[in-house]
Amino acid sequence: MNSGEKQDNLQAWGQQPSSSYSNTQQQHGQITGQIPLTITNQVEAHDNDFHMQDASNDELEKSKKIAEQPTEHPQQHHQQQPAVPRFPPQSRQPQAILRFPQPPITSINKANNSNSQNFFPQQEVLQSRPKKHRVSMTNAEAANTPGMPPEKLPAKKLSADSQRPLFRDSNVFQRSAGQFTNDNGPSSSSAIVGAPFDANSSSKPVHIQQFRNPNDAPVTKLTSDLIKTYKAINEKFQSFYLRKNVRRSTVGRHTSLDSSGKPKTGKEASSSDANLIETFSIHNAVPNTSSSGNQPHYDSHVNAPPLLDTNAPPTSTMVVPMRTETESQQQMRQKSSRGGPYNNGYDDQNYDYILKNGEIFDKRYVILSDTPVGKGSFGQVTKAYDTVTKEEVAIKIIKNKKTFFDQAQIEIHLLELTNAHDKDNKYNIVTLKGHFVHRAHLCLVFELLSYNLYDLLKNTNFRGVSLNLARKFAQQLGKTLLFLSSPELSIIHCDLKPENVLLVNAKRSQIRVIDFGSSCQTGHRIYQYIQSRFYRSPEVLLGIAYDTKIDMWSLGCILVEMHTGEPLFAGSSEVDQMMKIVEVLGMPPKEMLDIGPKTHKYFDKTEDGIYYCKKTRDGYRHTYKAPGARKLHEILGVTSGGPGGRRLGEPGHSVEDYSKFKDLIKRMLNFDPKQRILRTTLFPVSHTAYNQNLYHQQQIDQVPAVGSVYIEDNGMYRPVPTSSHPISVTSSFDDGDVIEIDPNRRRYSQQNYHNPNYQYSQQPQSSSQQQQQQYQQSQRAQLEKQQQLQQQQQQQQQQRQHLSHQPSQSVQQHSSSSSRSRPRQQDQAEWRTQLELEEAFKQRKAEEATAPRSLQYNPQQVVGVQLIKRVLISKLFQGSMSHGNVNAGSSRDMEKHDYPNNKL
């Protein structure tokens, strides 16, 4: 075989399709009698040489897809194609049209270098595909370009059938793009595209069909790339939330999960825990110049992974890897008996400290239980034993997060301030014994108390406590608010509710106010969202500036709930809360609504400036009643024997008692903070120096008696009568477990019940209290002397007025002097009736123009109606001198009998 025939065979071999590349290589070895071509060991060198040429990345991907073809092609593709005339021998160019780039043939090593010149006599190195396509070349350029047909055929419009791919078998594109194997070994990463080669007609060229892979279309390729990208992002999302759910569901232990989200067991879990797996989280990208205040943990807690920063501004969302646990941290966590995910195993997923029985805090406090006695958003409270003071205490362990740490520091400052002004603990505020930091947790040490008022309601099956016990709670809480609102403190509790009022003893009614974490001072208000929803005041709901009066609103809600057993305003949201308030108290004042920044949230305004309740989204006003339709009178059951009639017939629950309780609640729940009761307190018989000085500063002559509510309303102090039972007297009740027992006090006897001058047995008094009593007695003696002088002057004036015939002037002077001489502890209604009777008697006496007679009472001298009038006048004067009570009922009966036509 000469060199010309060999060249023709090589030209036909180059026109074969890539699917029959291995068979073609064997046939070519048989024809030429040479050793088959071998491929270099470095397949990557082909790609490097290929990238050095002008081929683009897209063309490289196409060549790799063509290489993914099976070793043995189906037989129907090897059918012989019709013969076509050959090109002139002088051109010596292959007729195959190359649709995809080929690696340079220079990278193929020949087994016999001496025979390589026989195959390519005119070219030393066969060039790769031309830089220009044949369509864009002229015939002259194609003639000078190796590997290109000399004549340019006219372009023909292909039909839809001709554009279909040649290989429709799906297995053609399922091979990997790394290499192509055959019987002789690995093949090249790319192949020559052409028609199948027939051994019988090896010297005849075949017709080549053009095809295009539809998967390589630009739109299809872009879509597939986007799908891959989003799929990768979703996988990273899933891995992050999967890890987050594991932290939430696992308390005090580590659980390994497989790809499906189920927990692993055995060797899989141990191997997965040993390997560090990097997870991803989606968070808002913030600048690196953020301050340390945005860090989620306390400054010493640096080992935990970062949290999601919800306060960061929304800039751009990106996927970043989270910090993984180091080997030292993992070993320390495994050695820890707690096994928590944070703080070297000492914190759980909620950043609460994992308690362990018998652990010692601050070298003196021994933890007494693994479970806390109370838990909240701030942290948890546990019971401990103080080895120094030999007493049990309560330790409040704050969460290991910076926000709670800063809030607890404010609570420490306010408690130290209140304890410094109340060293004797007279104002019912919890005592702070100390504070320290334990394993990055701020701990506060308090006195150990009993359960709270909400637990007390649960013990009564939410039937409520009696008015007597509610009055005792009101006395103590009012005293606390009076102390907190003093100018030296000016503290707003901001979270007064039954859960924050604790009993000192389960069998006593003495209480303590706790949880000053949300508190602030009047001039340093730092929170906008304060107070629990059921006890939130209207000014806070409307966004108006608030002061200490918001605690008085909360106190009114607490007192109603303690007696009825249910919250007065149980709103599910702020809008629902405002509507519940409007149902009972009516519409808020227009002045408040005009200045409220959040008024539009609850009310709409007409063109005339009238506010009305805002409609809901569905167009209806929900199921709310009209403003003021739900009466407080009916809620308390003033005339029906209490809430639901449960207190009907019980002592201390009369209509009069409920009426006074309702009036007190209405003054506490006034919309306008300026008209709301500032301070309310109930004072016992033995008064402290603080209260006594307060009375003298307000020019009050006499301290109110037992059972009176002392109210400061806009700076004016005045006594208001309460229920018939004094508050300081011990009493038992069957509606709860709280019983006040004091062996040093005597029970209230029925015979001395109406005697205001009766002195009950009291505990030994100190020197300061004795001085106060002496001062009080001296003041009373001076007052009696003044009253005697005034009466003498009145008698002299009456005689002069009778002689000068000026009755009207005498009546006015006598009424004014009588009003000044009246003791302050008498009932106002009885007082008013007696003054009117006295004025009527004096007026009729002046009209009779009789001489003044003796005012001494002698039953034997009572003759006729005129003597009965003088007896009444003498009794009135004697009552004013002795500061005693006057029997109003008998006086009214005598007045009716004597003067049937009198309108009084």
Curated annotation (Swiss-Prot):
| Required co-factors | Mg(2+)
Tell me which domain of life the UniProt entry assigns to the organism this sequence originates from. Answer: Eukaryota
The primary site where this protein sits is nucleus
What is the uppermost EC class here? transferase
Against CDD domains, the record matches this protein to: PKc_DYRK1
Q: Does the record's keyword annotation contain Membrane?
A: no
InterPro entries linked to this entry: Kinase-like_dom_sf, PKc_DYR1A/1B, Prot_kinase_dom, Protein_kinase_ATP_BS, Ser/Thr_kinase_AS, Ser_Thr_dual-spec_kinase
According to the record, the residues making up region (Disordered) are 1-151, 250-272, 285-345, 717-830, 881-904
The catalytic activity, as recorded, is: L-seryl-[protein] + ATP = O-phospho-L-seryl-[protein] + ADP + H(+); L-threonyl-[protein] + ATP = O-phospho-L-threonyl-[protein] + ADP + H(+); L-tyrosyl-[protein] + ATP = O-phospho-L-tyrosyl-[protein] + ADP + H(+)
User: Which Pfam family, any one, appears in the UniProt record?
Assistant: Pkinase
Q: Which GO terms describe its molecular function?
A: ATP binding; protein serine kinase activity; protein serine/threonine kinase activity; protein serine/threonine/tyrosine kinase activity; protein tyrosine kinase activity; transcription coactivator activity
GO BP annotations of the record are: positive regulation of DNA-templated transcription
- EC number(s) stated in the UniProt entry for this protein: 2.7.12.1
A GO CC term assigned to this protein in UniProt: nucleus
Q: Has keyword Magnesium?
A: yes
Task: Mark out the compositionally biased spans (Low complexity).
Answer: 24-35, 112-123, 749-820
Question: Residues in the active site?
Answer: D495
Q: Which cysteines are joined by disulfide bonds?
A: none
Location of the Protein kinase domain:
367-690
The similarity annotation says:
Belongs to the protein kinase superfamily. CMGC Ser/Thr protein kinase family. MNB/DYRK subfamily.
| Biological role | Possible role in the function of olfactory neurons.
Name of the featured protein: Dual specificity tyrosine-phosphorylation-regulated kinase mbk-1
Gene this protein is translated from: mbk-1
